[in-house]
Amino acid sequence: MEEIGIVIVGGGIAGLATSIALHRKGIKSVVLERAEKVRSEGAGIGTLSNGWRALDQLGVGDRLRLNSSLIHKARTMLIENGKKREFVSNIVDEARCIKRNDLVEALSDALPKGTIRFGSHIVSIEQDKTTLFPVVHLANGNSIKAKVLIGCDGANSIVSDYLQLNPKKAFACRAVRGFTKYPNGHGFPQEVLRIKQGNVLIGRLPLTDNQVFWFLVHMQDNNHNGKDQESIANLCRKWADDLSEDWKEMVKICNVESLTLTHLRYRAPSEIMLGKFRRGTVTVAGDAMHVMGPFLAQGGSAALEDAVVLARCLARKVGPDHGDLLKDCSMKNIEEAIDEYVDERRMRLLGLSVQTYLTGRSLQTSSKVLRLMFIALLLLLFGRDQIRHTRYDCGRL
């Protein structure tokens, strides 16, 4: 049986970022990715200042800035019964939209060759009865014993199942994300614009002068699976039918291949607060740990923060002399490092989880009473500074 110091399950944003963070601390890791190549599905990721701090610690921030534009303002419009209410806030700190594909490529390019093992489909995880370290079983019949196993395998995480975390919950809505190109320029201001009209929430973020990332959420329509790209595009056109002409045009001329349809899910705040995110030397990061709705645009940035904090905590305990973690590093030291990581992340993630949940529910409900209640709770818990979460600093790697 092959033995590896640190095994990371999942080659998405969280997994690649965690591997880079460990690499920059002199600690080797192997990333097991189910797909046959780097996963590039998905449209854009709104990345706020806390995410850019983490990207700079990972050494890829400057590369990603080259293909993204600064966002200067956030604007939300609520249209009800023909009446329009508008809320505007200036963005002082760094905020940009980046292509998910650009981010994944930047992360994968920063890793040593051979770090990512493609086509590695994990079917089960068990604990070795003698050493108590985790053993990963692959679909090809091979097994790997790891000193540390980090699950970065998304919302349907097999590692979170091993940790016996409670199942994720679902918002009663689906979201579509996509890109639209404007060959002659879009002419939109450099702002995040969200419009809530009826059961539809739509928003857009300029990526460059000629390209826009947009999202479309239907708060009640939960019955469409989107069998192919064209059916997703038709669904978007249907949802956007009551919107103004510029929004309908944006959806109509979009890059159909860029569209992704997702059922919005979240890990309950109570699970974030009380969940056991370590079992032996196994833990999770990214969506496997804290999948959340897109309402604060913090899912991707929170995963980047996880990577920095986890690598820092492990490096503090094992040191660069144990780069492959197969030498003298004890299970106790590893467990203590993971506990430090979980403790440091828990309250940060709890705040994001609660704020995201309340924001999503306030947008989703059709009851004015419930909406006012959710807004009152947001003000009570987070004050008038509702973007304070963007100023969080995960610290130096």
Swiss-Prot record:
GO terms for molecular function: FAD binding; monooxygenase activity. It comes from Arabidopsis thaliana (Mouse-ear cress). It comes from the Eukaryota. The keyword Oxidoreductase applies. Pfam families: FAD_binding_3. Monomer. InterPro entries: FAD-bd, FAD/NAD-bd_sf, MOase. This is Monooxygenase 1. The keyword Nucleotide-binding does not apply. Expressed in seedlings, roots, leaves, flowers and siliques. PANTHER family: FAD/NAD(P)-BINDING OXIDOREDUCTASE FAMILY PROTEIN, MONOOXYGENASE 1. Induction: Induced by A.brassicicola, especially in cv. Di-G during compatible interaction. Its cofactor is FAD. GO terms for biological process: response to fungus. Its EC number is 1.14.13.-. It is an enzyme of class 1 (oxidoreductase). GO terms for cellular component: endoplasmic reticulum. Belongs to the 3-hydroxybenzoate 6-hydroxylase family. Keywords: FAD, Flavoprotein, Monooxygenase, Oxidoreductase.
